[in-house]
Regions:
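Short, charged, amphipathic alpha-helical segments
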Residues: 8, 34-45, 93-96, 121-129
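Alpha-helical bundle segments that constitute or directly flank the non-heme di-iron/ferroxidase center
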Residues: 1-31, 89-114
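Charged, solvent-exposed faces of alpha-helical coiled-coils
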Residues: 10, 17, 43, 50-53, ...
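Preference for long, well-ordered alpha-helical segments
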Residues: 98-149
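Conserved alpha-helical segments that form or flank metal/cofactor-binding pockets of metalloenzymes
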Residues: 35-70, 138-144
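Carboxylate-rich helix-loop segments that flank metal/cofactor sites and access channels
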Residues: 56-89, 97, 101
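Long, non-catalytic architectural segments outside compact domain cores
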Residues: 23, 42-45, 81
Length: 149
């Protein structure tokens, strides 16, 4: 396995998550819900740190980090863009689903690439923990602002 190729694949997953959260941001502006917008911006910042840290490791390996999505990533973003969000709750549910998909993908990536250096494994473990925290943030938002549960 070429470490940088695998890390670029992982980085493209992060780019996909960032692209999907941009869609949520655009859609959330329609609802004039400042708490929702604030939450999405906060999560985008988390994704940005993931992008920066992963890019740094790829560059340290002497390779160029990708700025693009995989074909599957492009299709995933396109599919998300086609969704109609009628209320903030719809964005919350979609964000929980996509974050869960990212969490599962990161866990699978870590399992499939067990020979990665410890520094890289730690980065991916941190991403996994952040995805768990993001899910918790969404649940807290739903409980505090939507009032459904």
């Amino acid at each position: 396995m070429e470490k940088s190729n695998e890390l670029n694949k992982f980085l493209s997953y992060i780019h996909m998550g960032m692209s999907i959260y941009r869609i949520y941001y655009e859609q959330s502006e329609r609802f004039n819900d400042n708490e929702l917008i604030k939450l999405i911006v906060e999560i985008e910042e988390i994704f940005k740190t993931h992008e920066e840290k992963t890019t740094r490791i790829i560059n340290e390996l002497g390779e160029t980090a990708t700025n693009s999505l995989t074909a599957a990533g492009i299709m995933g973003v396109y599919k998300e863009r086609l969704k109609i969000f009628e209320e903030p709750f719809d964005i919350c549910i979609s964000a929980l689903k996509s974050t869960n998909m990212g969490l599962i993908s990161a866990i699978k990536f870590l399992n499939d690439n067990q020979e990665l250096p410890d520094k890289t494994k730690t980065l991916i473990q941190d991403v996994i923990k952040d995805y768990q925290n993001i899910q918790e943030k969404w649940l807290n938002y739903i409980f505090m602002n939507i009032g459904c549960c």
